[in-house]
Design a protein with these regions (language model features):
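Structural signal for hydrophobic packing residues in well-ordered secondary-structure cores
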Residues: 29-33, 51, 114, 157-163, ...
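Short, glycine/charged-enriched hinge/interface segments at domain edges or termini
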Residues: 2-19, 69-232, 237, 377, ...
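Flexible glycine/proline-rich
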Residues: 19-22, 36-41, 50, 63, ...
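Intrinsically disordered, low-complexity, positively charged segments
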Residues: 11-73, 77-81
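Helix-rich terminal scaffold detector
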Residues: 1-18, 180-313, 317-323, 334
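Generic structural signal for well-ordered, non-membrane alpha-helical segments
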Residues: 14, 18-22, 36, 40, ...
Length: 424
């Protein structure tokens, strides 16, 4: 499983900025071993294990980008129309060794290979046909409406770098260069638990002081979106020995174990102690809100080579979501061999005033709407408690307030990250 040292998550500062957290993950966590070859149709969501090199050029040959007439640019008059003899006809896919001679045009269709010697194509809408001749206007640039072999990707170039998380466009490129299979990293195996004496299975018997488990479903869905194989290990009660036993057993066969709840300093918060008893634990007080301290560690199973990374998230579902996308996701990507992701929050106008503490990154749940002038603006959800799940279902994404910002006024611009951006 994951090759982690006891102190890989150790950090001595007071509040760890997010950028430092990302750097620590890059420096101290190594991707898991294990590569498998998958057919292209099953490759979406997987991570390329090596650079994928183009065995052929894309496109493989010079071809026409339009339906029209292929010509030799050197034949064209700079002063007015040029009359050319239509000497042939080339459909897409037609094998031909047609070569164009001076004074000729070849009728050509989109995707057809350019005749040898032709370098420019007129669109059929722009020419005048008269029997076997065609009159083409002046002013078209050499190379117009033509696509050149390798202009998309030369043969031998890197089509997809190692660590690419394959999505539809990457699979399409691999297919376009003729590949049928790709070497990808094996899927990560992740175990999840919920903790808490008050937490019960949805659909199960619920006594008056119990709540249905939301976090395991949140975590399973987030992890599966990122391509992990999830083992759902259920709900653990707030019992130190039971927790330690369950966590120890879970390390076997898993790269990562994620729990929610029980990590703060209440009397029923035993996750810290349980992890310390069976492995090593550090607390990352990350400079992020929402998201109280996140427990990071390594847990060891019965046999010596069975170890897994551990992340203990807070219990409140919104805090679970934010700490997952900002802390667990970078760790998961690193373990999976994926390149680090750079998020680009898009500036949107805020419709509200907001104050925050300096030196921490803050995330605010917002909906987007059109302002009276038609510009997009962000509206804060009226409830900002970390336990308010509808504040996630009724909004579009998170505004990201940078560390150095302390207040914004209506009309200011703040970076917006959609839930889709955050979860991918
Ligand atoms: P804790 O960190 O264990 O004190 O939990 C903080 C809050 O999150 C408490 O109100 C818990 O009831 C709630 N909570 C913990 N686990 C879950 C869960 N799996 N689903 C929904 N809410 C939870
Ligand atoms: Mg609890």
């Amino acid at each position: 499983m994951a090759q982690l040292t006891d102190d890989c998550f150790a950090f001595s500062g007071p509040l760890l900025p997010l950028t430092d957290m990302e750097r620590l993950i890059g420096e101290r966590v190594a991707p898991v071993d294990g590569v498998e070859r998958v057919p292209l149709r099953l490759a979406r969501g997987r991570v390329t294990a090596d650079d994928v090199i183009a065995p052929v050029a894309l496109p493989p040959f010079d071809n026409s980008a339009v339906d029209g007439y292929a010509v030799r640019h050197a034949d064209l008059s700079a002063e007015g129309d040029t009359k050319l003899a239509v000497a042939g006809r080339l459909m897409a896919g037609a094998q031909s060794d047609v070569a164009i001679r001076p004074g000729e045009a070849i009728r050509i269709f989109t995707g057809a290979a350019m005749p040898a010697g032709a370098d420019t194509v007129f669109m059929q809408e722009d020419v005048t046909v008269d029997g076997d001749t065609v009159a083409v206007p002046k002013g078209l640039k050499r190379g117009a409406n033509s696509r050149f072999a390798g202009e998309d990707l030369p043969a031998g170039n890197v089509a997809l770098p190692a660590g690419t998380v394959l999505d539809a466009q990457h699979v399409a490129l691999a297919a376009a260069i003729g590949l049928t299979e790709l070497d990808v990293r094996r899927r990560l195996r992740v175990a999840i638990f919920s903790t808490g004496d008050e937490v019960v299975e949805p659909g199960g018997l619920r006594h008056g002081a119990a709540i249905y488990d939301a976090n395991r479903f949140l975590l399973a869905a987030l992890l599966e979106r990122l391509g992990a194989e999830v083992t759902d290990l259920g709900i653990l009660s707030d019992d130190p020995d039971g927790l330690a036993r369950a966590l120890k057993n879970s390390s076997a066969g898993h790269d990562l174990v994620v729990t929610s709840g029980g990590v703060s300093t209440g009397e029923a918060d035993h996750v810290r102690g349980a992890v310390e008893a069976i492995g090593s634990l550090v607390f990352w007080r990350i400079a992020i809100k929402p998201g109280r301290p996140v427990a990071m560690g390594v847990i060891r199973g019965a046999s010596h080579n069975e170890s897994a990374a551990f992340v203990g998230l807070p219990g409140n579902p919104v805090a679970v979501f934010v700490t997952f996308v900002r802390v667990v996701k970078p760790l998961l990507r690193r373990l999976s061999g994926a390149l680090p992701q750079t998020l680009h929050p898009l500036p949107v106008r805020v419709a509200f005033a907001y104050k925050k503490k300096k030196d921490r990154r803050e995330y605010v749940r917002v909906s987007l709407r059109r302002g009276v002038d038609g510009e997009l603006e962000a509206v804060k959800h009226p409830q900002d408690g970390a336990g308010i799940l509808t504040s996630l279902t009724e909004t579009d994404g998170l505004l990201e307030f940078a560390e150095d910002v302390t207040s914004v006024a209506p009309g200011d611009r703040v970076g917006f990250l959609s839930y889709a951006d955050l979860m991918n």
